[in-house]
Amino acid sequence: LITNGEKGLARKMSALRSFYGYYFKHRIIQKNPTLLVDMPKLHDKAIIRLDTDEVALLLDFVESAGEHLTGQALNYYKKTRDRDIAILTLLLGTGIRVSECVGLDIKDVDFKNNGIMVTRKGGNQMVVYFGDEVAEALKNYMAGDRAAATPLPGHEQALFLSTQRKRMGVQAVENMVKKYARQVTPNKKITPHKLRSTY
């Protein structure tokens, strides 16, 4: 539900701050205008979510985790890094559900308009738009690992593939998010649903 109530505004500001903060830190942009805007106050109970710094830390960790790995763990990381960055950036940048994320086909991604066609609960389809940061992560994955992959029969159209060359499932994404989040926010039980709260 798209709203401009305090929750809707806070959600949009949180997403903007997350991405501006990340790209400012990496010197891709010179200014972070979101720091000049106060976050809307929420008057209901606190929700566990990632703050701007934690989003940056999470993405940084996924990008550089291979520095601390060897052997099979390093090989697995290299195979999944770009995919995992694309998934995390997409979840954080759009607020879509994990089930909607894993249900995406390659044809559902429209870079001309920066949108994805998602199938909502009940089967309704709608376009969800994304920013340049999400586009960059998706293009990097799709032009690299996804283009080089040979999916198993029946999984040729899937956007996100497992290391078994099948469409990723909800459980696999949930496990991936928890794995990385544990390293960055050990005191918060972060799940993909919490990433939607961050959005």
Give each language-model segment a name.
Residues L1-Y199:
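Conserved catalytic core of the tyrosine transesterase superfamily
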